[in-house]
């Protein structure tokens, strides 16, 4: 919750803040999820799935700052006052972080265009890693440019041959652009993208080989649906989906306890003097409007962190008055997106996977 500086001022409510460093530097209220880091270190190829707007990008950013060797001098600044700041693992700030963001992928109408857009987006992350770690890479320059797979291979080869620290790969929204193909009714192109010799399968084959050879410590992926990994199993059969594992159920989203603590903070700072009756009134409104996620029969109820934070930010801005709009229109579920994934004859697997993912949701107003 704190940055180790004491809670002596009003912390801002961090609506739509996905950068961990910004979260800490600007003193935003942070619901601490760093206690899940040690458990994640038991896996080499974990995948964690949650619905849209559930805090996945902030989790990716937090892990990037934790493992990046170039951020070692900022460890106390960024993690002071958090659980992991008090219980750091031996692996903190030990790796060459390579961070991909597939949510920024631009679609195309044919395979050639998709490949080009994939390369345009994903050549940059390895170049950034080299530049940020120039003290290790010296005068190294890529011999191949414009091909994301080959550049990743070349980087891993250099790591291996020069005994450099391992890479730690993070992929945010790994299924975003393939989901776009499905929702745009481009099934034939989707099939091309996920075939055995496609650029995407080759990309994950390189990662699998790197994990096996010891040049990659971990490849952590977030996404919404498991279907893409189902279709890529021949090339990436080491993936471990953590979505429904009991120990990780609360890694994203806010529990009742976390939400009550958050609400009490907002009332104390932005509506001082609010009575317990006022707390109970607002709490009941929150439960009635935002309660709706349970990812296991034995799991706790969870709130969507982005939707809840939207309400609390508006509530704070109104000095403790209930805002007229309880949900940001930009966050309402894209019904066409769900309909496309669940009604297409050719996407039966998507139907099963998506239904399973949301099987234990209750009545959230998304």
Task: Locate predicted features.
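Conserved P-loop NTPase mechanochemical-coupling segment
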Residues: 16-17, 105-148, 178-190
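Structural recognition of the conserved hydrophobic beta-strand(s) that form the central parallel beta-sheet
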Residues: 170, 217-224
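Amphipathic alpha-helical segments of the small helical/lid subdomains adjacent to P-loop NTPase cores
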Residues: 228-234, 242-311
């Amino acid at each position: 919750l704190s940055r180790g500086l004491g809670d002596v001022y009003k912390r801002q409510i961090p609506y739509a803040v996905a950068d961990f460093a910004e979260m800490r530097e600007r003193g935003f209220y942070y619901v601490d999820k760093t206690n899940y880091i040690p458990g994640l270190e038991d896996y080499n190829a974990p995948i964690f799935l949650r619905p849209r707007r559930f805090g996945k990008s902030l989790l990716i950013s937090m892990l990037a700052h934790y493992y990046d060797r170039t951020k070692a001098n900022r460890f106390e600044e960024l993690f002071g006052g958090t659980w992991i700041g008090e219980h750091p693992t031996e692996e903190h700030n030990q790796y060459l972080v390579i961070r991909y963001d597939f949510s920024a992928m631009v679609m195309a109408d044919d395979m050639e265009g998709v490949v080009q857009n994939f390369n345009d987006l994903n050549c940059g992350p390895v170049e950034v890693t080299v530049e940020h770690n120039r003290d290790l890479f010296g005068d190294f320059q890529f011999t191949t440019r414009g091909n994301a797979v080959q550049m990743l291979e070349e980087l891993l080869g250099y790591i291996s041959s020069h005994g450099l620290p391992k890479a730690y790969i993070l992929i945010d929204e790994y299924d975003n652009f393939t989901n776009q193909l499905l929702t745009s009714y481009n099934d034939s192109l989707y099939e091309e993208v996920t075939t055995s010799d496609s650029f995407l399968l080759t990309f994950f084959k390189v990662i699998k080989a790197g994990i096996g050879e010891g040049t990659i410590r971990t490849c952590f992926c977030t996404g919404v649906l498991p279907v893409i990994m189902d279709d890529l199993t021949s090339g990436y059969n080491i993936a471990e989906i953590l979505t429904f594992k009991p120990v990780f159920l609360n890694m994203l989203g806010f529990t009742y306890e976390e939400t009550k603590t958050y609400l009490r903070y907002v009332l104390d700072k932005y509506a001082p003097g609010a009575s317990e009756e006022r707390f109970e009134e607002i709490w009941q409104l929150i439960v009635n409007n935002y309660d709706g996620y349970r990812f296991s029969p034995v799991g706790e109820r969870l709130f969507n962190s982005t939707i809840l934070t939207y309400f609390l930010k508006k509530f704070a801005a109104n000095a403790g008055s209930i805002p007229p709009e309880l949900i940001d229109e930009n966050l309402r579920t894209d019904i066409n997106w769900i309909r496309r994934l669940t009604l297409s004859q050719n996407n039966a697997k998507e139907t099963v996977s998506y239904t399973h993912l949301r099987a234990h949701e209750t009545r959230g107003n998304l």
